[in-house]
Amino acid sequence: MSLFDYTIKELEEKLHNKEITVEDLVKESYQRIHEVDQEVHAFLTLDEEKALEKARELDQLEDKTGILFGMPGGIKDNIVTKGLRTTCASQFLDNFNDPLYDATVVQKLQKENMVAVGKLNMDEFAMGSSNENSGYEPTRNPWNTEHVPGGSSGGSAAAVAAGEVLFTLGSDTGGSIRQPAAFCGVVGMKPTYGRVSRFGLVAFASSLDQIGPVTRTVEDNARVLEVIAGHDQMDTTSANVEVPSYTEALKQDVKGLKIAVPKEYLAEGVSKEVKDAILEALKVYESMGATWEEVSLPHSKYALATYYLLSSSEASANLARFDGVRYGVRSENADNMIDMFKKSRSEGFGEEVKRRIMLGTFALSSGYYDAYYKKAQKVRTLIKNDFDKILEEYDVIVGPTTPTPAFKVGEKTSDPLTMYANDILTIPVNLAGVPGISIPCGFSTEGLPIGLQIIGNYFDESTVYRTAYAYEQATEHHKKRPQLGGAK
């Protein structure tokens, strides 16, 4: 049995009782990475020497305090880490080896004495749904390496599923934590927009991006969010709202809980296996005293188009800073300064990033702004209003995280629109700004995980966690492990 089959709380007790050391945990993490990551490709950069040095320092401390004391974790490679290479999985930043500061979430993790083992693979600049847009080797799904892990936080989900680390951080702009969590059979939370500081997150779409945790269990997830959540003066979009004890919320049952199930989330396009898994999950909730009713989110059918217009427009502006002057790739074939800007960006960015920059620039251009960008903002408000109305009457919204289980590597790369449709059930949550979590709720006939998505009201992650935990404890799905490289 791997040490990483225990929860963070259980490992904390083992450390306290001196059954294990922090060095044991960190060594196990790297041993597992060296054993299986040549198949999974979850990590882009490792920090083994410094991590082991920190582990030994922590073992020497008499006061072993910290909510995540000694726990090995991984950081998505678009979250800045001081002195540790940060590439956003882009060749443009391949030589960005020494960032000058830590993101706020990294500072908070360090304050609780976690150990960062390395930086995780992703779709380039977080633009993608399969991790096939990585500027390096694409991450593979630990349950079947012929399948994708999801994206853009594919490395974050795959590393946890493969037992390489106890927890990871990802970012979620349109489903980039929840979708890979569903594909990899782990727990992934996108908090309320503003709940977690974005300072130090390389921006994709600033009005949609949110950092969140990926773990094997709901309890571990709640524990990590308690650490990283909270107001930050360095982020003007950070909400000054009190952070409750999410782990305390897990102790409450779901008797009397009112669940809304949008008919649009079980409509055509959602596979029968996924529908059946969701309906079975609803039966579990009924057995625990919760009730559910079918509802409608009528504007969700416009969410995909709205999202890609808005997110690409914001990306067009945010990625303008990557010009080859201060850091990153600089073309050696330029005739002048303007030519250098153009060629550096053309040579440094991958195809999907360039596609979205062009789409966003078009939507913001003179003559098209009102027809596209402004109209998309109005539709976003309608989508938000749909959620507000439902969440006034119900405690949570429940449905599938993805329309299907993980698809095969290369299956959808030739058709961007088909690829984009994978996020159709997660995107509305980002547009509304509400919290959402994905937890395992079954497996396909091919043995691939299926995810249950639970959506809550603004800053009410506690109810989302309570709902997720009740289901998790009533089922066994989260206890299954992929058979990878002689897996645990």
From Swiss-Prot:
GO terms for cellular component: glutamyl-tRNA(Gln) amidotransferase complex. It comes from the Bacteria. It is an enzyme of class 6 (ligase). Keywords: ATP-binding, Ligase, Nucleotide-binding, Protein biosynthesis. The active site is at 76 (charge relay system), 152 (charge relay system), 176 (acyl-ester intermediate). It catalyses: L-glutamyl-tRNA(Gln) + L-glutamine + ATP + H2O = L-glutaminyl-tRNA(Gln) + L-glutamate + ADP + phosphate + H(+). InterPro entries: Amidase, Amidase_CS, Amidase_dom, AS_sf, GatA. The keyword Isomerase does not apply. Its EC number is 6.3.5.7. GO terms for molecular function: ATP binding; glutaminyl-tRNA synthase (glutamine-hydrolyzing) activity. Gene3D superfamilies: Amidase signature (AS) domain. Signal peptide: none annotated. Pfam families: Amidase (PF01425). GO terms for biological process: translation. Coiled coil: none annotated. Belongs to the amidase family. GatA subfamily. HAMAP family: GatA. Heterotrimer of A, B and C subunits. Allows the formation of correctly charged Gln-tRNA(Gln) through the transamidation of misacylated Glu-tRNA(Gln) in organisms which lack glutaminyl-tRNA synthetase. The reaction takes place in the presence of glutamine and ATP through an activated gamma-phospho-Glu-tRNA(Gln). This is Glutamyl-tRNA(Gln) amidotransferase subunit A.
